[in-house]
């Protein structure tokens, strides 16, 4: 949600900011703006809409070597040019961009801004106005910035520009990601590494409640007590080409096609020199010794967690629960004596999940994070981390991260089962290899998936997904993909729940996509298909080879049934993609959605 870019150096800041913001589009936004400084003053450009709209509004003749930029996802105040960042102080001396939520902005307004008329509806403007009030009362900019930060309650990543000192950008963070990229006679600030790869791949991570003074020659990190902090730098394991679409029309399609490669990479990552699956011993021991596992996640990661729970309970024989992070924070269940918490987050920055992590760490419990981003907040704050190694996922709708999460959870469960002396009953390495081949075969059948999307989903307003057992969990993910990018009201249901209310929604022509990959419930789901067909539904059955029937719309390659979610989801991803495409929707950047949800 939202994104920040800042630059100070010798190059054209305007172009670096715009290109950086383009790399942050995947995070979700509804407006954008930049502020650049030169000898003529500070020039602010803001627009509601896409970065392309902002680029068109920027004066191409303005040259600058310093500036800050922002993509906004509205939390306080409607999406508009007025509420877009950057925001300026009353005198125009200070310009500021901010990600996060300032929870006490109303109180700050009452206490410090009696004589200031706010121009926007945002919490952000309050921050820059308070900074100016402190400067008006005699403090220098750095001290005014520090004093203001000490007043703030909530989450923030902030970049501040003082027009009387155009050689410095002031930066701070708390509960919202922010990096400082290091260069030769320049430095950059960004919400994530993708925005800075155009100029550097070396960066330092900021910790909560730290402030930074950034010039073209130096980066000075301090805590809010004013004490200097030392920090090692990292090299981003990304190349600029990793975040390009290449020949693909959309990132989502590219990322769907990358799933076979990701599967093979995961197998290689978690194999030892003898070809045996392996994870660090302290992690498998932590799971094996737990009396209950609590999986915490949101959205797609939650759906992956539902599948992972089955692996952990069925293979490792460890009781497991799956909880939506935002609900767990406020309704924590009665915990077991020796729990292990597993947090699943593609970005590693999900605010709801982090809030739970903070809670359980205070209680003294151990936590494991599954994430795609090394060095992310969740990976730093958890006791253990398992990386997905899926590569950058740019499209807002997650695809390859979902299957990577399931694969890593399967490996975790299998290794834990072995450490507990439990027999898996099959060779997981071999079966995951078969999965990779099946994924490849499915990705080669896009024409068939497009035909299904046209036939069932081009004009409908509603769609239902039904399944039983593991298929039900995949139906939840399939329905989420469809609603995310096509805006069709799609819902996933357990087949057995149809008769308890849902079947009342079935009418002539209602699309019902049914998964049939589990032999022990095959007759039951077939009965559910007959139920909805009798009431006028238009059924689309996707079955596993060996379980197919004559009227099935599509048959999946044969794979181990317990791993079927890794392949059955791919047709659902492709069907959602083509449904959105033919309905004229923005596939990679659906309305109102953010890739990385960094506010609660």
Curated annotation (Swiss-Prot):
One of its GO terms (molecular function) is glutamine-fructose-6-phosphate transaminase (isomerizing) activity. The active site is at residues 2, 595. Residues 2-217 form the Glutamine amidotransferase type-2 domain. Residues 283-422, 452-590 form the SIS domain. Keywords: Aminotransferase, Cytoplasm, Glutamine amidotransferase, Repeat, Transferase. Its EC number is 2.6.1.16. It is found in: Cytoplasm. InterPro entries: GATase_2_dom (IPR017932), GFAT (IPR005855), GFAT_N (IPR047084), GlmS/AgaS_SIS (IPR035466), GlmS/FrlB_SIS (IPR035490), Ntn_hydrolases_N (IPR029055), SIS_dom (IPR001347), SIS_dom_sf (IPR046348). It catalyses: D-fructose 6-phosphate + L-glutamine = D-glucosamine 6-phosphate + L-glutamate. Homodimer. This is Glutamine--fructose-6-phosphate aminotransferase [isomerizing]. It comes from Bacillus licheniformis (strain ATCC 14580 / DSM 13 / JCM 2505 / CCUG 7422 / NBRC 12200 / NCIMB 9375 / NCTC 10341 / NRRL NRS-1264 / Gibson 46).
């Amino acid at each position: 949600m939202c994104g920040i870019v800042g630059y100070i150096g010798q190059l054209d800041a305007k172009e670096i900011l715009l290109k950086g913001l383009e790399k942050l589009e995947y995070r979700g936004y509804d407006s954008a703006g930049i502020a650049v400084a030169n000898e003529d003053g500070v020039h602010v450009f803001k627009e509601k809409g896409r970065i392309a709209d902002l680029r068109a509004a920027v004066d191409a003749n303005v040259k600058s070597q310093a500036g800050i930029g922002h993509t906004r996802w509205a939390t306080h105040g409607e999406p508009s040019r007025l509420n877009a960042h950057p925001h300026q102080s009353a005198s125009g001396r200070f310009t500021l961009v901010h990600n996060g939520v300032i929870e006490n902005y109303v109180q700050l307004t009452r206490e410090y801004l009696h004589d200031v008329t706010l121009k926007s509806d945002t919490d952000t403007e309050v921050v820059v106005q308070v900074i100016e009030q402190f400067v008006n009362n005699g403090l220098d900019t750095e001290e005014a910035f520090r004093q203001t930060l000490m007043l703030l309650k909530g989450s923030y990543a902030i970049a501040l520009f003082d027009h009387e000192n155009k050689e410095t950008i002031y930066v701070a963070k708390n509960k919202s990601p922010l990096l400082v990229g290091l260069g030769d006679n320049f430095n950059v600030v960004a919400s994530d590494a993708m925005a800075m790869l155009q100029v550097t791949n070396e960066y330092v991570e900021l910790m909560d409640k730290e402030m930074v003074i950034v010039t073209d020659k130096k980066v000075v990190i301090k805590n809010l007590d004013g004490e200097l902090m030392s920090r090692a730098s990292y090299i981003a394991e990304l190349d600029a080409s990793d975040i390009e679409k290449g020949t693909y029309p959309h990132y989502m399609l590219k990322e769907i096609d990358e799933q076979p490669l990701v599967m093979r990479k995961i197998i290689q990552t978690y194999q030892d020199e003898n070809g045996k699956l392996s994870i660090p011993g302290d992690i498998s021991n932590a799971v094996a010794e737990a009396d209950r596992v609590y999986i915490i996640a949101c959205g797609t990661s939650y759906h992956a967690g539902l599948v992972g729970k089955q692996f952990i309970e069925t293979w490792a024989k460890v009781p497991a629960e799956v909880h939506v992070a935002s609900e767990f924070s406020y309704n924590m269940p009665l915990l077991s004596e020796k729990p292990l918490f597993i947090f699943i987050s593609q970005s590693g920055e999900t605010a709801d999940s982090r809030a739970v992590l903070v809670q359980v760490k205070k209680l003294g419990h151990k936590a494991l994070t599954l994430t795609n981003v090394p060095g992310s907040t969740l990976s730093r704050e958890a006791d253990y981390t398992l990386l997905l190694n899926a590569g950058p996922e740019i499209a807002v709708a997650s695809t390859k991260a979902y299957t990577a999460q399931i694969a890593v959870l399967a490996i975790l469960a299998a290794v834990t089962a072995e450490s507990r002396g439990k027999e898996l009953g099959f060779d997981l390495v071999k079966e995951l290899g078969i999965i990779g081949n099946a994924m490849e075969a499915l990705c080669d059948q896009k024409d068939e998936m497009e035909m299904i999307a046209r036939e069932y989903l081009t004009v409908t307003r509603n769609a239902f997904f039904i399944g039983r057992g593991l298929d039900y969990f995949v139906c939840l993910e399939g329905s989420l993909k469809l609603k995310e990018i096509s805006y069709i009201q799609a819902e996933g249901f357990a087949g057995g729940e149809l008769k308890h209310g849902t079947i009342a929604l079935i009418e002539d022509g209602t699309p019902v996509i049914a998964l049939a990959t589990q032999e022990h419930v095959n007759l039951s789901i077939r009965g559910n298909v007959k139920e909805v067909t009798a009431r006028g539904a238009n059924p689309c059955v996707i079955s596993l080879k060996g379980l197919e029937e004559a009227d099935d719309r599509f048959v999946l390659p044969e794979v181990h049934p317990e791993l079927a979610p890794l392949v059955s989801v791919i047709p659902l991803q492709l069907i959602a993609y083509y449904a959105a495409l033919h309905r004229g929707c923005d596939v990679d950047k659906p309305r109102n959605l953010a890739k990385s949800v960094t506010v609660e």
